[in-house]
Amino acid sequence: KVLFYDFINQHFDFPSTSTMSDGARECVIRSYGLSDEMINKEADKWLLQWIDAEYKLFKAFETKFYGDRLRTPFESMDELIAFSNTLLNRRKSRAGKSLEHHLARIFTCADLRFEAQVVTEDNKKPDFIFPGGREYHDKSFPKDKLVCLGAKTPCKDRWRQVLNEAGE
């Protein structure tokens, strides 16, 4: 908790999704004294821990930056809806990017070659391409050595996007 409070107190505005992910992950890594080897052995466990920690951190930032506003009546329904939409959109955006940031860290710990958000044909951007964009665009590179990964959460709401990025 001390690491969380220190991280929160360093920020005077809502941090970016990458800063939030990095901060939550660092808090967990430091709390448990994790090495890359330990993360590799139980990647699923630590991925879930990081996501949970980031969500808690995110809610603490919401309270810090929006708590006072919630205690004050809204002047109109439109004002309430606009405020609510701002919060909801931030939450939705954060959830998807959070997973991508944490997966990238796991791939890095495992010494995997990958690239995130590579622009492919028709301006599509799969979340990850293994081993990378250069190989993807190299027509002589064996297709069976390429992997595209769409990291979506929750998948039930995003299957159309996954199919689009896959070119289906």
For the regions a protein language model found, what residue spans apply to each?
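Surface segments flanking catalytic/ligand-binding clefts of nucleic-acid enzymes
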Residues: 74-78, 112-117
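Catalytic core segments in nucleotide and nucleic-acid processing enzymes
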Residues: 101-104, 108, 114-168
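Interdomain/boundary linker segments immediately adjacent to catalytic/signaling cores
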Residues: 6-97
